[in-house]
Protein backbone atom coordinates (compact mmCIF):
# COMPACT_ATOMS: atom_id res chain seq x y z
CA UNK A 1 0.00 0.00 0.00
CA UNK A 2 2.84 2.43 0.75
CA UNK A 3 4.21 2.04 -2.77
CA UNK A 4 0.80 2.88 -4.24
CA UNK A 5 -0.12 5.84 -2.03
CA UNK A 6 3.34 7.28 -1.33
CA UNK A 7 5.74 6.19 -4.10
CA UNK A 8 8.48 8.57 -2.89
CA UNK A 9 8.31 7.16 0.63
CA UNK A 10 6.52 10.27 1.95
CA UNK A 11 2.79 10.90 1.65
CA UNK A 12 2.44 14.32 0.00
CA UNK A 13 -0.97 15.95 0.43
CA UNK A 14 -2.14 19.24 -1.12
CA UNK A 15 -5.03 21.29 0.25
CA UNK A 16 -6.72 24.67 -0.20
CA UNK A 17 -4.83 26.91 2.17
CA UNK A 18 -7.53 29.61 2.03
CA UNK A 19 -10.36 27.27 3.05
CA UNK A 20 -10.79 26.96 6.84
CA UNK A 21 -13.10 23.99 6.34
CA UNK A 22 -10.08 22.01 5.15
CA UNK A 23 -7.45 23.45 7.46
CA UNK A 24 -5.75 26.46 8.96
CA UNK A 25 -2.07 27.43 8.87
CA UNK A 26 -0.51 28.81 12.04
CA UNK A 27 1.14 32.11 11.01
CA UNK A 28 4.10 31.55 13.34
CA UNK A 29 4.82 27.82 13.13
CA UNK A 30 3.29 27.24 9.65
CA UNK A 31 1.80 24.01 10.99
CA UNK A 32 -1.55 22.91 9.57
CA UNK A 33 -4.51 21.98 11.75
CA UNK A 34 -8.03 20.84 10.92
CA UNK A 35 -9.62 17.92 9.09
CA UNK A 36 -6.97 17.76 6.36
CA UNK A 37 -4.16 17.50 8.91
CA UNK A 38 -5.98 14.86 10.95
CA UNK A 39 -6.87 12.73 7.93
CA UNK A 40 -3.41 12.92 6.36
CA UNK A 41 -1.75 12.09 9.67
CA UNK A 42 -3.94 9.02 10.16
CA UNK A 43 -3.60 7.83 6.56
CA UNK A 44 0.19 8.15 6.73
CA UNK A 45 0.22 6.27 10.05
CA UNK A 46 -1.73 3.40 8.54
CA UNK A 47 0.49 3.29 5.46
CA UNK A 48 3.61 3.53 7.62
CA UNK A 49 5.26 6.56 6.03
CA UNK A 50 5.99 10.18 7.00
CA UNK A 51 3.89 12.92 5.43
CA UNK A 52 3.99 16.52 4.31
CA UNK A 53 1.04 18.86 3.77
CA UNK A 54 1.36 21.28 0.87
CA UNK A 55 -0.70 24.52 0.88
CA UNK A 56 -2.22 25.43 -2.49
CA UNK A 57 -3.82 28.72 -3.47
CA UNK A 58 -6.86 27.30 -5.27
CA UNK A 59 -8.38 24.22 -6.86
CA UNK A 60 -6.35 24.65 -10.05
CA UNK A 61 -3.17 24.60 -7.98
CA UNK A 62 -4.20 21.39 -6.20
CA UNK A 63 -4.91 19.69 -9.52
CA UNK A 64 -1.66 21.04 -10.94
CA UNK A 65 0.37 19.56 -8.09
CA UNK A 66 -1.19 16.15 -8.70
CA UNK A 67 -0.59 16.29 -12.44
CA UNK A 68 3.02 17.38 -11.90
CA UNK A 69 3.52 14.43 -9.53
CA UNK A 70 4.54 16.74 -6.70
CA UNK A 71 1.55 15.64 -4.59
CA UNK A 72 0.09 12.16 -4.11
CA UNK A 73 -3.34 13.19 -2.87
CA UNK A 74 -5.30 16.43 -2.77
CA UNK A 75 -8.38 17.77 -1.03
CA UNK A 76 -11.19 19.38 -3.04
CA UNK A 77 -14.95 19.81 -3.12
CA UNK A 78 -16.53 17.63 -5.78
CA UNK A 79 -17.82 19.05 -9.04
CA UNK A 80 -18.24 17.49 -12.46
CA UNK A 81 -15.71 19.62 -14.40
CA UNK A 82 -12.98 18.80 -11.88
CA UNK A 83 -13.91 15.11 -12.07
CA UNK A 84 -12.89 15.18 -15.73
CA UNK A 85 -9.31 15.91 -14.57
CA UNK A 86 -8.93 13.98 -11.30
CA UNK A 87 -10.63 11.07 -9.57
CA UNK A 88 -12.67 11.85 -6.45
CA UNK A 89 -13.06 9.64 -3.42
CA UNK A 90 -16.35 9.33 -1.62
CA UNK A 91 -16.84 12.47 0.52
CA UNK A 92 -15.54 12.64 4.06
CA UNK A 93 -17.50 15.81 4.94
CA UNK A 94 -20.38 17.95 3.72
CA UNK A 95 -19.67 21.68 3.67
CA UNK A 96 -22.66 24.01 3.70
CA UNK A 97 -22.63 27.09 1.47
CA UNK A 98 -24.53 30.27 2.25
CA UNK A 99 -24.65 34.00 1.54
CA UNK A 100 -23.33 36.98 3.43
CA UNK A 101 -25.15 40.30 3.00
CA UNK A 102 -25.25 43.76 4.54
CA UNK A 103 -26.89 43.77 7.95
CA UNK A 104 -29.71 45.98 6.59
CA UNK A 105 -30.24 43.93 3.42
CA UNK A 106 -33.81 42.89 2.55
CA UNK A 107 -32.43 39.45 1.63
CA UNK A 108 -33.52 37.15 4.48
CA UNK A 109 -33.14 33.67 3.01
CA UNK A 110 -31.22 32.12 0.13
CA UNK A 111 -34.20 32.08 -2.24
CA UNK A 112 -34.49 35.88 -1.88
CA UNK A 113 -31.11 36.32 -3.59
CA UNK A 114 -32.27 35.01 -6.97
CA UNK A 115 -34.09 38.13 -8.12
CA UNK A 116 -33.66 40.30 -11.19
CA UNK A 117 -31.45 43.30 -10.49
CA UNK A 118 -29.48 41.66 -7.68
CA UNK A 119 -25.74 41.04 -8.03
CA UNK A 120 -24.46 37.88 -6.39
CA UNK A 121 -20.71 37.41 -6.04
CA UNK A 122 -18.55 34.30 -5.80
CA UNK A 123 -14.87 33.51 -6.34
CA UNK A 124 -13.62 31.97 -9.57
CA UNK A 125 -12.96 28.24 -9.35
CA UNK A 126 -14.76 27.77 -6.04
CA UNK A 127 -17.55 25.22 -5.74
CA UNK A 128 -19.97 28.04 -4.90
CA UNK A 129 -19.31 29.90 -8.16
CA UNK A 130 -19.91 26.74 -10.18
CA UNK A 131 -23.19 26.06 -8.37
CA UNK A 132 -24.46 29.64 -8.60
CA UNK A 133 -23.68 29.99 -12.32
CA UNK A 134 -25.62 26.82 -13.00
CA UNK A 135 -28.58 27.42 -10.71
CA UNK A 136 -29.43 31.11 -10.34
CA UNK A 137 -32.03 32.08 -12.93
CA UNK A 138 -32.75 35.78 -12.35
CA UNK A 139 -29.92 37.40 -10.39
CA UNK A 140 -26.66 38.45 -12.03
CA UNK A 141 -23.77 36.24 -10.91
CA UNK A 142 -20.50 38.16 -10.72
CA UNK A 143 -17.46 35.89 -10.63
CA UNK A 144 -14.44 37.49 -8.97
CA UNK A 145 -11.00 36.46 -10.22
CA UNK A 146 -9.89 35.49 -6.70
CA UNK A 147 -11.30 35.21 -3.20
CA UNK A 148 -11.44 38.80 -1.91
CA UNK A 149 -9.93 39.72 1.42
CA UNK A 150 -12.43 40.30 4.25
CA UNK A 151 -11.88 44.04 3.94
CA UNK A 152 -12.42 44.02 0.17
CA UNK A 153 -15.58 41.97 0.45
CA UNK A 154 -17.00 44.21 3.17
CA UNK A 155 -16.40 47.26 0.97
CA UNK A 156 -18.13 45.67 -2.02
CA UNK A 157 -21.19 44.74 0.02
CA UNK A 158 -21.47 48.03 1.89
CA UNK A 159 -20.98 50.05 -1.30
CA UNK A 160 -23.65 48.04 -3.09
CA UNK A 161 -21.30 46.61 -5.71
CA UNK A 162 -22.60 43.22 -4.57
CA UNK A 163 -25.92 42.40 -2.91
CA UNK A 164 -24.70 39.06 -1.57
CA UNK A 165 -21.62 36.87 -1.70
CA UNK A 166 -21.68 33.07 -1.70
CA UNK A 167 -19.04 31.03 0.11
CA UNK A 168 -18.79 28.23 2.66
CA UNK A 169 -20.61 28.98 5.90
CA UNK A 170 -17.48 28.72 8.06
CA UNK A 171 -15.71 31.43 6.06
CA UNK A 172 -18.76 33.69 6.21
CA UNK A 173 -19.33 33.21 9.95
CA UNK A 174 -15.74 34.29 10.60
CA UNK A 175 -16.21 37.33 8.34
CA UNK A 176 -19.47 38.43 9.97
CA UNK A 177 -17.96 38.07 13.45
CA UNK A 178 -15.30 40.60 12.49
CA UNK A 179 -17.68 42.97 10.66
CA UNK A 180 -20.95 43.72 12.53
CA UNK A 181 -22.37 45.55 9.49
CA UNK A 182 -22.59 42.18 7.70
CA UNK A 183 -24.69 39.08 8.46
CA UNK A 184 -24.89 35.50 7.25
CA UNK A 185 -28.23 34.13 6.08
CA UNK A 186 -29.70 31.46 8.36
CA UNK A 187 -30.11 28.86 5.61
CA UNK A 188 -27.81 27.32 3.00
CA UNK A 189 -28.09 27.21 -0.78
CA UNK A 190 -26.02 24.05 -1.32
CA UNK A 191 -23.79 21.48 0.32
CA UNK A 192 -20.38 20.68 -1.18
CA UNK A 193 -18.85 17.23 -0.82
CA UNK A 194 -15.31 17.50 0.54
CA UNK A 195 -13.25 14.65 -0.88
CA UNK A 196 -9.75 13.34 -1.48
CA UNK A 197 -8.57 13.48 -5.11
CA UNK A 198 -5.89 11.59 -7.01
CA UNK A 199 -4.69 11.47 -10.61
CA UNK A 200 -7.13 9.71 -12.92
CA UNK A 201 -7.20 6.07 -13.75
CA UNK A 202 -5.92 4.21 -10.68
CA UNK A 203 -8.91 2.33 -9.31
CA UNK A 204 -6.93 0.32 -6.78
CA UNK A 205 -5.54 3.47 -5.14
CA UNK A 206 -9.00 5.03 -5.06
CA UNK A 207 -10.44 1.91 -3.44
CA UNK A 208 -7.84 2.12 -0.65
CA UNK A 209 -8.69 5.77 -0.02
CA UNK A 210 -12.43 5.10 -0.06
CA UNK A 211 -12.05 2.34 2.53
CA UNK A 212 -9.99 4.68 4.69
CA UNK A 213 -12.63 7.42 4.48
CA UNK A 214 -15.44 4.99 5.27
CA UNK A 215 -13.56 3.92 8.39
CA UNK A 216 -12.66 7.51 9.35
CA UNK A 217 -16.31 8.54 9.17
CA UNK A 218 -17.65 5.42 10.91
CA UNK A 219 -15.09 5.61 13.73
CA UNK A 220 -15.86 9.24 14.52
CA UNK A 221 -12.44 10.52 13.44
CA UNK A 222 -13.96 13.01 10.98
CA UNK A 223 -16.60 14.28 13.40
CA UNK A 224 -14.03 14.68 16.17
CA UNK A 225 -11.79 16.65 13.82
CA UNK A 226 -14.65 18.93 12.75
CA UNK A 227 -15.65 19.53 16.36
CA UNK A 228 -12.06 20.22 17.43
CA UNK A 229 -11.69 22.80 14.67
CA UNK A 230 -15.01 24.40 15.73
CA UNK A 231 -16.30 24.47 12.15
CA UNK A 232 -19.76 25.86 11.38
CA UNK A 233 -21.95 24.23 8.75
CA UNK A 234 -19.73 21.16 8.32
CA UNK A 235 -20.74 17.56 9.03
CA UNK A 236 -19.15 14.17 8.58
CA UNK A 237 -20.51 12.65 5.38
CA UNK A 238 -23.06 9.87 5.90
CA UNK A 239 -22.53 6.48 4.31
CA UNK A 240 -23.86 5.87 0.83
CA UNK A 241 -23.01 9.21 -0.82
CA UNK A 242 -21.53 8.83 -4.30
What do these predicted regions represent?
Residues 60, 76-85, 131-134, 158-190:
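A ligand-binding cleft/hinge motif common to bilobed small-molecule-binding domains
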Residues 92, 101-120:
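Flexible hinge/capping segments at coil-to-helix
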Residues 3, 127-147, 180-185, 214-242:
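Ligand-binding clefts/hinges and TM-proximal coupling segments of bilobed small-molecule sensing domains
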Residues 53-64, 107-108, 143-155, 192:
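Short helix-initiation/N-cap motifs at beta->coil->alpha
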Amino acid sequence: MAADLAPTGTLRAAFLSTNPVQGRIDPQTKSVTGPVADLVRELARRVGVPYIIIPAADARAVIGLLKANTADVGFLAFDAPRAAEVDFSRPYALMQNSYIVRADSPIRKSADADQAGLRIGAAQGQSQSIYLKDNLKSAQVKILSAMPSPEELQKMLVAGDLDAFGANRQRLVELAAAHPNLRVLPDNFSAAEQSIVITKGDRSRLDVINRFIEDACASGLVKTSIDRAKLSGVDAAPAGIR
